[in-house]
């Protein structure tokens, strides 16, 4: 038994995902996933806003193999704060098949950054979703960005669409490649031609260093249908958004499962059916190759490209 009690109502990851009908291209990368603990080995951070179920590296890599991915990018989960040990352990245990994205504080030493790099970390995540993290001053984040730029790392940013105007100047001043999580969480009820989503497309159009993950339809969808019970046309309301980004910026998009799907309230998707969502947003083999192989390899394994 874990020493940690899960947040009431917590949804555990889907235990027996289906085998995807969509065959992933060889070398496909799950470019956004997490590990949680296990809490008895890697305790959750005291300042966390939620307490998850355990989701171990072994379970993550079993899912990788089941779905047909070759590699993973393991993103530091907010429940671990700036204690990157669980993520680093997952990367080190992957036989070179995983890279990491860390959360760091201003106090981190150059030697500690180098240790993260040697473990496979290639980016840091700045989270602006207020319900998930406490505020960090922007000057501190900019200082961190300047330091990690020297290692060739990038910055991953997580924010809500409504906050893009106030964050614009900060984001556009970052000295690295910038990767947006989940298309900046658009409100899909406003439609793909909304002013809100137009601003996000402008952000990408005007800044060639900005990439986007076209992931997490299960978080963004309002009308579904859900990726459950064999549903092959899940999350129709999200498709136009992701497809627009993939087709306009084919060389700057990534995709990931977001396993084990932290903080979902409505339902827990079947990860096999999430993979079957991909051809709806990247309809050609060429777009699928860029989204799933070429782009993540260029960003995370450039030495192999």
UniProtKB/Swiss-Prot annotation:
Disruption phenotype: Disruption of this gene results in a strain unable to grow on protocatechuate and a variety of aromatic substrates funnelled through this compound (m- and p-hydroxybenzoate, p-sulfobenzoate, phthalate, isophthalate, terephthalate, vanillate, isovanillate and veratrate). Growth on benzoate and o-aminobenzoate (anthranilate) is not affected in the mutant strain, indicating that these substrates are metabolized via a different lower pathway. The keyword Hydrolase applies. Optimum pH is 8.4-8.8 for the hydrolysis of 2-pyrone-4,6-dicarboxylate. It holds the Pfam family Amidohydro_2. Induction: Induced by 4-hydroxybenzoate. Its EC number is 3.1.1.57. Substrate binds at residues 32-34, 50, 78, 125, 131, 158, 182, 263. The keyword Transmembrane helix does not apply. The active site is at 258 (proton acceptor). GO terms for molecular function: 2-pyrone-4,6-dicarboxylate lactonase activity. Keywords: Aromatic hydrocarbons catabolism, Hydrolase. It catalyses: 2-oxo-2H-pyran-4,6-dicarboxylate + H2O = (1E)-4-oxobut-1-ene-1,2,4-tricarboxylate + H(+). Strongly inhibited by 1 mM Zn(2+), Cu(2+), Mn(2+) and Co(2+) ions. Also inhibited by 5,5'-dithiobis(2-nitrobenzoic acid) (Ellman reagent) in vitro. GO terms for biological process: 3,4-dihydroxybenzoate catabolic process. Involved in the degradation of aromatic compounds via the protocatechuate 4,5-cleavage pathway. Catalyzes the hydrolysis of 2-pyrone-4,6-dicarboxylate (PDC) to oxalomesaconate (OMA). Also catalyzes the reverse reaction. Belongs to the metallo-dependent hydrolases superfamily. PDC hydrolase family. This is 2-pyrone-4,6-dicarbaxylate hydrolase. The lineage of its organism: Bacteria, Pseudomonadati, Pseudomonadota, Betaproteobacteria, Burkholderiales.
